[in-house]
Amino acid sequence: MKTWENHQIDGINRMPARAHFLTFPSKEKALLNNNRYTHAFKNLNGVWKFMFLDAPEYSPEGFFNSDFDVTKMDDITVPGNWQLQGYGKMHYSDLWYNFPINPPYVPTENPTGIYKRTFFVEESYRDKKIIIRFCGVDSAYHLWINGKEVGYSKVARNESEFDITDLIRVGEENDVTVRVYQWSDGTYLEDQDMWWESGIFRDVELIGVPKDGINDYKVIADLDDEYKNGIFKVEAFLRTTKEVNVTFELVDAGENTVFTKTVVAKEGKACIDEVIADVNHWTAETPYLYKLFMTVEDDGRIIEVIPQNVGFRNIRLNGETFLVNGVAIKFKGVNRHDYSPQNGRVVSREEIEKDIILMKQFNINAIRTSHYPNSYYLYDLCDEYGMYLIAETDLECHGFELTGDYKWITDDPSWELAYVSRMTRMIERDKNHPAIIFWSLGNESAFGCNFRKMTDVAHEMDPTRLVHYEGDFDVESADVYSTMYTWIENPKKPYLMKDIIEKSKKPHIHCEYCHAMGNGPGNLKDYQDLVYAHDKLQGGFVWEWFDHGIESFTESGEKYYRYGGDFGDDPSNKDFCIDGLIMPDRTPSPGLYEYKKVIEPITTTAIDIQKGIINLLSRYDFANLDRFNLVYKVMEDDVILQTGFMAVPSIEARANKDITLPYDLSVIKVKPGAHYYVNISYQLREDTSYASSGHELATAQFELPLYKEGIMVRPEGILNVEKEHTTLHVKGANFSLDFNLVNGNLMNIVRDGMQVLSKGPRLTLWRAPISNDMEIIDKLKKVYFLHLEHEVVMNIDYHMEGNILKVEVDTINSTTNSAWHFKTKYVYTVCPSGDILIDVEGTPSGRVDLAPDMLPRIGVSMHLDKSMEHVRYFGMGPGENYADSKEAAQMGLYANTVDGLFTNYVIPQENGNHMGCKWVSMTNDRGMGLLASTEGDFNFSASWYEDKDLDDAKHTCDLVKRDYIVFNVDYKQNALGTNSCGQWQLDKYRAKFEDFKLSFRLTPFNNKEVLDKHLAAERICLDK
């Protein structure tokens, strides 16, 4: 049997797994905690020689020898994935294996990479134990040093170390050869939802450590039952049985020694078990870290010093909740892969730190390391910045679900070692990180005897943490009840959130929810409201953090991102990897801004907004709200009338308090048609590790009880109306427009010789599909044909009422082959001033029983002159917003451009909607343009693209701007949902086949003659 097809071989000559740490010759250097100051450390990253083969058997004779001719080998960068460096084939799938399922066997044609390089070993390594460490190799490999075979390892995202002391020539050049196999028996356990990428993708390190030093250690920093004193235990395991002295010194954040003790190692082990009085606690909100220094001495000579961050916290079950430091915390988390758009799974510490900082800035407090141990940098950073971790085993065998025997290997005892060793190696590497709250057994691999064994071993190895596994549906072994994408409402689903609330006897975690694919996710607030309302619901992890697009360029140099199927990979789940809260270049999506708002640390409620009395409710689990300042602004449209600054008073976690904002509404002279709001911003009072003082973490907005009806304007002047064949010409003093008397359309509007509108409003029920329409798009297109719209004119009438023209158009609006339809009535009231009052009213008719249960939109679409790209509007902004994704938006007066309104999703789709709009102006550089306004409110969007353009385009580079602007005014836009994997649009947010009336006014104008907001405040009086 081939080594790489033997699931009962965990490794050959690999060292036992241990914690990842650095060792230093002195405390002074240990304080710097940088590998440059260790005893001996060499990073073997860089350019290696490389040979790509179709199978291991094609390896040339003697390829591992030191004298092998490498001149004909290619260069390759380590760390790196060979597919992104021109070898093999990129392939993305969510669950399919890329070969026949016949465990443990893999294809004979097994892409293989031979890596070679030389390296000089300095004198600093002499008399040291020399270890070579591979932090990540996909999927399995053999290792040779100086032509001698060292061993074999697998499990792509686990570290592996080999003792090569006896093979290294100190003071000379040495060489290393690694033969990597794309497929191994381990691949059956590495079927995660991600790109299949191979090679040496994490750091390779050459480490020299003292032979009498510490090989491994375990730190337990717990709390007593009163959560007051620290339970501090350390076990250090040495490489020697000599009775050396080991000093354990614990230093606080102020560099004060709080504990020190020296013990004599016995039989290769040194231990302490102490109580530290009145310790500071570690939490994600208050990540207080002590520093432990372990110093090994022999006869007064320092052998080594090892630094280790220590955080005291306690984790325990308490009936239907789990507690951290006695509190039933709420996870406000994300699932995170290691990912780079340029380098795939090769990520730097700097990239990871940017992620953590961004998460903290957006109120995220937890990460699930989906679905494998992430780069070790992540864990240090989560300890330091404050981020709870569910640390997940590199284990998923999702593809077996399609065989009808999901438990095929999960319930096969012969695979026990393969399952358990993956978890034990993870626990050993990461056991000393306070950020880790749960060990997770893996993902989407059914349940069976091997998971039972994993649970038992995890509890035995680490009784201080809890065990998570979503696949344990009956919560037979896991400590918490974990689910994915549990729906809030759906009569066809057997188990909803309400069932968890009513029936579950264990804490609940939503390990994946609110699938963030494309424009979305929706329903975030609905889920979070449930979490806040029920103790047993302890939050969840949005799927997921990144869009996993691969950075690419067109021939002209335009950047875009490729996804599944773009490399000829088949089968592929296509754009299912484009499902993150941030885009591939780490730009926050509108969904991330929405999530930030939904999980913000302060909930603000108006008690008496006229008097400025509001209530502040802390959503923190531990921190006090006195870390914030409050800035308020009383707004009149875009004008700040009053502003103030105050320190948020002391409010303990989860407590609330009324405060009064000292504004005075009595002095405000209310203007006709103006809108008044108070905007509240909660900002960090002091600099933190993740943001500067002044960074905003929470907001609130309340409409003020100030309003005066807009100025009534009676139309004056004369209209010239003339019928010419099928066209009705209308002229005023400085404008003209035409109606088509065949289809009833408003054909154009001209102001001072400039055509501001080239196609008038026409009812549309369609919008470009969003990624979250994935499960219903075929039904929308192939059953209801909603993208194939038809308007049949039943009657057109026009007449004068004094100096005002009324045009009435009755239509039937529906789609191809549909027996349901709207009876629609357009009423245009054209005034001599140039104002056009438009009412569009629809009534469901025909076979209403055959109509869809929701519509993409109900609104009208127009074409405007391409020069009118400057946008001002009073409505919800600044980002796009939809019925189930609008918490981050505030009412206000915003200025933008058509380009600026466009959200550049990796896969073009519906975007840029704004709800609650009172008016919108579209103008050119000279101020000439068109105003749309209403006494109620409407949705609007403006784009360079028709819905068909967005629907047809597969990438952003496929989009070609139209020579006009598409301007939409909608009665209702459908919600977003998360139905790419989860809850569809909730009933209360849907656009339905229902009676509707959309009323608005179009006014051609010059913004330099009259300001848009003043024009919008006018009310047209038609009374005689």
Where are these regions (language model features)?
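Substrate-binding/catalytic cleft of secreted carbohydrate-active enzymes
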Residues: I356-M359, A366-L581, P590
